Amino acid sequence: MAKNEHTLKLEHHVFEPQRHSGLPDIVMLHGICAGAWVFPKAFLEPLLDQGCRVHTLSYRGHGESEGRGRIHDWRLSDYVSDVVSILNALSEPAIVVGHSLGSAIAQVLIRDACPLAAVVLLSPVPPKGLSTIALRMLWSDPIAYQQLAIAFTVGVHQVSGRVAARLLFSKTDVTDDVRQFMSQCCDESPWLALDLQGFSRIAPLKYDPRRMPPVVIVSGDDDRLIRPSDATESAQLYQTDVHWVGGGSHMLMYDQGANSVSQWIGHQLKQVLQ
């Protein structure tokens, strides 16, 4: 367990490779209602096999971290502080891999000039926030919009399993793995829904590759939440291309080809850090 500046104990796991490649440590940042558990060992193993030391953590109020009783008080800035407390304890700037909410936190770190070796954005929140996505969903998929509102207010365990399967896993049926995933989820701070809208910008206004870390973007072309146009918006800001995962859902770590995705990430990081 690590501690943040409020002395809350944070769940923090370190996975060591059999042989180190010399790459900086990789710190995985999870999405909403999740925790360190959301990155399956099968997704991490290709990175370990390539010689990377990998960290997973849970923000305050998530997973095994303290602060669950105040989950409705926490803001995006609190989760950023938790991540910074982990990064500051490392001996050198790390590689940050952020999924969904974690990608928003990673972009805040870039904006705030936090020392980083590289950043990987998975199923990325657009630089301008989720307001455009929320409006699109309100008009094109009002049931999904309603269910997301329920997740942030009534609680994630009141969300329709069928809607969760469709939005997160691009599935039409509620399978056992979807049920297992949802059973592990925790409630989320309603403030986060506001913080992620983008009224206060989460990303740098302009990306300067000369003084900012290299950015890698990975997104599924069948993501029902972060559409291809949203991922492309991120790529335009960070002056890069999207690595499209064919048939990939929002939860890339759980797709059939998840290990191929993490293997590609490891190879790509070696290239951008050469």
For each predicted feature, which ranges?
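Flexible "cap/lid" loop of the alpha/beta hydrolase fold
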Residues: 115, 119-150, 192-199
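Conserved alpha/beta-hydrolase "acid-adjacent" motif
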Residues: 224-230
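Catalytic histidine-centered segment of alpha/beta-hydrolase-like enzymes
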Residues: 248-260
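The serine-hydrolase catalytic nucleophile loop
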Residues: 32-44
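Conserved alpha/beta-hydrolase
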Residues: 47-68
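Conserved acidic catalytic loop of the alpha/beta-hydrolase fold
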Residues: 78-94
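Short beta-strand/loop motif that positions the catalytic acidic residue
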Residues: 211, 217-219
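Active-site glycine-rich loops that stabilize anionic/oxyanionic intermediates
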Residues: 31-35, 100, 221
